[in-house]
Amino acid sequence: MADIEELKFDAEVGKVLSLVVHSLYTNKDIFLRELLSNASDACDKLRHEFLSNHDLMEEGEELKVVISVDKDSKQLSICDNGIGMNRDELIANLGTIASSGTQRFLEALGGDKAKGYDLIGKFGVGFYSVFMVASEVVVDTCRAGESVGYRWRSSGDGGFTIEKLGEDVPRGTKITLTLKEDESGFLDKFRIEHVVTTYSDHLGYPVYFLDEKGEEEKLNSGIAIWTKPKAEVTAAEHLEFFRSVAHIGSEPWMVIHNKNEGAIEYTNLLYIPSVKPFDLFHPDRRCSVKLYVNRVFITEDNVQIIPQYLRFIRGVIDSSDLPLNISRETLQNNRIVEKIKTSVTKKVLSALKEKAESDHESYSKFWENFGPVLKEGLCEAMDTESREGVLSVCKFHTSACAAGELVSLADYISRMKPGQESIFYLSGDDLESTKRSPQIEKLVSSGIEVILLVDPVDDFWTSVVSEYKGVPFKSVMRVGEKDLEKCIGASDDSGDKTSEDSGESASDKESIGSFIEYLKKVLDGVVSDVRVSKKLTTSLVCLAVPDNSMDIRMERFLREQKQLNYKGNRILEINIDHPIAKSLLKEHEARGESELLNGIVHLLYDEACIIEGEEIRSTVDFASRINGVLAKIFSSK
């Protein structure tokens, strides 16, 4: 008798098994879909390895999957003649899961059973769905090119055994399930056929049912739907294929199906989901488009067939111009792959632009899901044409937009005021507070539209993208007097002028000048400059930065990430028409410098910092100054 090794599942697999068996699925048909998908992958891998080793199979041999049942023993078997597994692969594939992946799966599930359908396939745990219906699972397998087979057996109770078989085990894998008492329905041929045609009809390999007479009946069409003419692919076929490649239970938001017959021949069948994939913001930023060569699966790992900022796309790209024996390593810098990537990217951006122009409501939902990811592309190295292609499909909230409304850059430029030379934008933590920021008061009151940026990625792309269609971007934090004069002088009919613009007397100007110099003296070493604000109308103070300085939010992020160890220059702007500013000016005229007034000046700077989300220098000093002002107020009553 052959030696039998008794092994334990790793700890996280045990948790997954418990979820799968007791609570995860409401649709148990899924286990068969998972097994058929695995069998198809095994055939794909054999075909790929056969390209470099013709001893692995006979030339022209049919790769297939065969389903059979034994009603007396209550056993269901799924057999493929694909790549097979050796002992180490059995343990690696069926005994362990990468702990990080499993933990993410468990955290993602978070007690919500309904999420299981969408998440199970993403973390390599689909095989374990067999234990929903099986009391015992036996896997007999032999690796292509090897002569020794192995048997893996488990009841899903925490462990498994590995047994070495003889040398007459056929290449491939046979999975035999002993079904639970109440799962005998899966022995019915018609139910099996329904599951196959529902979930696996698109597989590139025939799936047969072996009847009692030993005859094989084909259950699936075996058609790769991306090879069919675009007009002949039905909505039902798209839905089925999308769910199989995306592991998402919803419908696709957009289908992009093209056959390119130019200098490079390829077919793409791509789907944009209507919901966010779970792994959208995974640190690896992995893309999930499968690369085929003449219907032979090559890889979906370690190759950037689409840019990372389009990683929400699912589907396949099939090319006849790549060699069948291309290795995954040489794909990295392959000229044809790069050309396909460039071409596909243009097709996707073109489709998005057309959708954005024709269906604003639908596109707004897409943008809510994937806008931040798409904007990541603006941070990547690309030529001007490519960057403008991404910018052309971007949508933004602005100071002039109603709730939920988005505008394109083309829309914004078409609404620019006479004399306005820049696309004004302001970054903030959230839409509501950014829309109320003191920074944009004068611009908004003068009818100048400001783009409001609230995604973390916005601070990055605005530091590398300087213009769109020849119109420069300019942060409101850097807007100065000249910028305002150019655009507001032609568009401001409100009569809202500052004291310096309203014909104040020479003595008034002198008093204001003296007061500003006083503020500079008190805040020397704290700010690089103090100036009368031209962009405040109702607020007292705000911060600004010099033209060539980094935006405050970006600088703060880099400091938090320990990538920056200094604080850039700040400019304090004060609204000299504000009642408090007027009172401080009078106090300075009447009494000059005082300890109380000095404290209030520091409070003005602290207020400006708080508005911008900046840390104040000393909470102790801040509290002391507040108390000093309050004491003065109440002692005078």
Swiss-Prot record:
SUPFAM superfamilies: ATPase domain of HSP90 chaperone/DNA topoisomerase II/histidine kinase, HSP90 C-terminal domain, Ribosomal protein S5 domain 2-like. The keyword Ribonucleoprotein does not apply. Keywords: ATP-binding, Chaperone, Cytoplasm, Nucleotide-binding, Stress response. It is found in: Cytoplasm. It comes from the Bacteria. Residues 557-637 are annotated as: C. PANTHER family: HEAT SHOCK PROTEIN 90 FAMILY MEMBER (PTHR11528). This is Chaperone protein HtpG. It comes from Anaplasma phagocytophilum (strain HZ). The gene is htpG.
